[in-house]
Regions:
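Self-processing/autoproteolytic domain segments and adjacent N-terminal interaction modules in large
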Residues: 1-146, 163-175
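Functionally constrained cores in energy, signaling, and assembly domains
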Residues: 134-136, 154-155, 183
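Small-side-chain structural scaffolding
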Residues: 136, 148-150, 186
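Short, flexible loop/turn segments at beta-strand junctions in immunoglobulin-like
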Residues: 159-161
Length: 192
């Protein structure tokens, strides 16, 4: 099921939230989508998405005139699909328990911001600093590295310059890569 806004008009109204949003979560393998065509370049479009009880908006800022179809469901899965194998409790502890599917119909790249309620944060995720939060893309056959910036108070994550689309999730950004030293020379100096 897809609902389409053909003229790129921003969604009007106010007070979007848990009780007022576009519900794209459906049962089984079916996935609901909300499509917005003719989105102007560099205009931020907030799409008031959710699952019927939780508000999970998506903000897209396209680089060029674009069209996107978006949907969201709760219950993150191994393959980013609504009927996929659920993450184990251990894996869910470090992520937001939701999947945002963003498909580009036309255009090039965009910046994206994903929002979520604290109730979807895993126990470990809730302890992450802002610098440790990013957006991960389903890279088939696995979830890719989480990159971008986050805010664990406002419960948002942003990823810039996205040009490959499909399912996205929110998790921990990678650690600094370890360095292997082949040679290290140190000396005592300055009285220390």
């Amino acid at each position: 099921v897809t609902v389409t806004i053909a003229n790129g008009t921003a969604i009007g109204g106010s007070a979007f939230g848990a009780t007022k949003h576009i519900n794209t979560q459906v049962g089984g393998a079916t996935h609901g989508f909300f499509q917005v065509d003719n989105m102007s370049a560099l205009g931020a479009y907030t799409l008031p998405m959710g699952n019927g009880t939780l508000y999970l908006p998506i903000t897209l800022t396209p680089a060029t005139l674009s069209s996107f179809s978006v949907g969201v469901f709760t219950g993150i899965t191994e393959d980013g699909l609504p009927n996929g194998t659920a993450f184990t409790a251990g894996k869910k502890a470090g992520v937001v328990d939701a999947v945002w599917t963003i498909n580009r119909n036309s255009g090039t790249s965009c910046d994206m911001t994903l929002d979520w309620p604290a109730s979807l944060e895993g126990a470990t995720f809730a302890t992450y600093t802002n610098a440790q939060i990013g957006i991960s893309h389903w890279d088939n056959p696995n979830w890719g590295t989480s990159v971008g910036t986050g805010d664990n108070t406002l419960n948002t994550a942003t990823r810039s310059g996205v040009s490959v689309f499909s399912p996205f999730g929110v998790g921990k950004t990678p650690y600094v890569l370890p360095i292997k030293f082949n040679y290290l020379n140190a000396a005592k100096g300055n009285g220390y």
